[in-house]
């Protein structure tokens, strides 16, 4: 076991105990100092981020992935503001969610408490570093971060700034830490740090999620993989459908709530597809369509079976013509990743059927999948989008970083 892991695990465990009973004011003061420090030391962050960008370009990293990695002054301000926004959110720790009295006179309550030490493994998104730190701090959890090697310089600087701010706020050393060793061997050891980690949350592509699920012995909350679909019903508004698919695919193609597949009812395909594909191509999107799609719009690439289950995270879209709503639902439930799915329709009964029968964390009617986000849902910053069903599902905000403690008040009762 890597010695860095043991040292940081012990520090995190000690910090988690102190954080568990820190007051809301103490935690909010720490968040305020983090937010202010990120803005004050923006130039330091950008200097380190420049190093990461230069290395990524040398490696031939795609433009979409570079966009996830790149920081500028506005993005750093946005990160700092997201931290400050967490201050405004209600502190769930200590909340008694229910209280009941037993016939023997015992009063039993259910209280929200921190998870303890949260481990987060993620890829080339420096904003995750600050978001995760803020949410864990607010909920009284210590956090150990393991970011991707692509963003190591940016992440180390952000955590350095956070650590200085927490020290100034009088919060414990070890509250927020990051692994400097980004090797796969250390990552695997991190996934098995059961003595110190209470939960492990991976954020990234399918490869990362699979590696964590297959290797971890620490309890895992799966997040992130988004093979999201937009289904255009035969009773859809054409203009609305075009606007939604263009937004869902092109606004930020490298994020997990971006659309990766477009399903179109055969009754509307000849009217819808030429308009939609033209608009998508104008945004630089490569279309990979089924044979029926290619008959309608010839200037596209043919999709393979592999395409239907793939999360591109790029300016690529799979397009398939389906017979009806039932085939669309069947296709989504077979190839989707249970993240976010959307139907465009004017038919109420079709929309209700889609909502009931599609198995996903977020299911939309006449809206872009890009709204699956903690901020957009009003939760503030998120720790990730859970695609599993146990403990948490969908955008994970503050409450999803807590667990229950039973508190029992007696008056001398014995059994």
Swiss-Prot record:
Q: Which GO terms describe its cellular component?
A: cytoplasm
Any one GO MF annotation of this record: glutamate-5-semialdehyde dehydrogenase activity
- Record keywords, A-Z: Amino-acid biosynthesis, Cytoplasm, NADP, Oxidoreductase, Proline biosynthesis
Short name of any one Pfam family annotated for the protein? Aldedh
Q: Which reaction does it catalyse?
A: L-glutamate 5-semialdehyde + phosphate + NADP(+) = L-glutamyl 5-phosphate + NADPH + H(+)
* EC numbers on record: 1.2.1.41
Metabolic or biological pathway, per its Swiss-Prot or TrEMBL entry: Amino-acid biosynthesis; L-proline biosynthesis; L-glutamate 5-semialdehyde from L-glutamate: step 2/2
InterPro entries xref list: Ald_DH/histidinol_DH, Ald_DH_C, Ald_DH_N, Aldehyde_DH_dom, G-glutamylP_reductase_CS, Glu-5-SA_DH, GPR_dom
By its UniProt entry, which Gene3D superfamilies does this protein fall under? Aldehyde Dehydrogenase, Chain A, domain 1, Aldehyde Dehydrogenase, Chain A, domain 2
Indicate where this protein resides in the cell: Cytoplasm
What biological-process GO terms show up in the record? Answer: L-proline biosynthetic process
Function of this protein?
Answer: Catalyzes the NADPH-dependent reduction of L-glutamate 5-phosphate into L-glutamate 5-semialdehyde and phosphate. The product spontaneously undergoes cyclization to form 1-pyrroline-5-carboxylate.
The family line of this record is: Belongs to the gamma-glutamyl phosphate reductase family.
Protein name, please? Gamma-glutamyl phosphate reductase
């Amino acid at each position: 076991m890597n010695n860095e892991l043991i040292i940081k695990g012990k520090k995190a465990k000690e910090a988690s105990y102190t954080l568990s009973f820190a007051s809301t004011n103490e935690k909010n003061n720490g968040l305020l100092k983090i937010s202010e420090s990120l803005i004050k030391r923006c130039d330091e962050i950008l200097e380190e981020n420049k190093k990461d960008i230069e290395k990524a370009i040398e490696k031939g990293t795609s433009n979409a992935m570079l966009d996830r990695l790149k920081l500028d002054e506005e993005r750093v301000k946005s990160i700092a503001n997201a931290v400050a926004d967490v201050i405004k959110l209600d502190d769930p720790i200590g909340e008694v969610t229910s209280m009941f009295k037993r016939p023997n006179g015992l009063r039993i309550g259910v209280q929200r408490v921190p998870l303890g030490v949260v481990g987060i493994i993620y890829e080339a998104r420096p904003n995750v570093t600050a978001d995760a730190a803020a949410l864990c701090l607010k909920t009284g959890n210590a956090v150990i971060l393991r970011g991707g090697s692509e963003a190591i310089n940016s992440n180390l600087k952000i955590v350095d700034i956070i650590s200085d701010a927490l020290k100034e706020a009088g919060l414990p050393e070890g509250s927020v830490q990051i692994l400097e060793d980004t090797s796969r061997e250390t990552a695997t050891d991190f996934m098995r740090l059961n003595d110190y980690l209470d939960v492990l949350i991976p954020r990234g592509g399918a490869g990362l999620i699979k590696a964590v699920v297959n290797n971890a012995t620490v309890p895992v909350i799966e997040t992130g993989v988004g093979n999201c679909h937009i289904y255009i019903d035969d009773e859809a508004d054409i203009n609305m459908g075009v606007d939604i698919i263009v937004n869902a695919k092109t606004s930020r193609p490298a994020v997990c709530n971006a659309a990766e597949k477009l399903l179109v009812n055969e009754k509307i395909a000849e009217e819808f597809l030429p308009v939609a594909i033209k608009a998508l191509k104008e945004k630089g999107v490569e279309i990979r369509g089924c044979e029926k799609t290619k008959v309608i719009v010839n200037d596209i690439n043919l999709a393979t079976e592999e395409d239907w289950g793939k999360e591109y995270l790029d300016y690529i879209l799979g397009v398939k013509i389906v017979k009806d709503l039932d085939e669309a639902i069947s296709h989504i439930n077979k190839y989707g990743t249970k993240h976010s799915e959307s139907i465009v329709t004017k038919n109420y009964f079709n929309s209700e059927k889609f909502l009931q029968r599609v198995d996903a964390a977020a299911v939309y009617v006449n809206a872009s999948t890009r709204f699956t986000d903690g901020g957009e849902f009003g939760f503030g910053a998120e720790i990730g989008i859970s695609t599993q069903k146990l403990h948490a599902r969908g955008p994970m905000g503050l409450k999803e970083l807590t667990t229950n403690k039973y508190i029992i008040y007696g008056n001398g009762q014995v059994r």
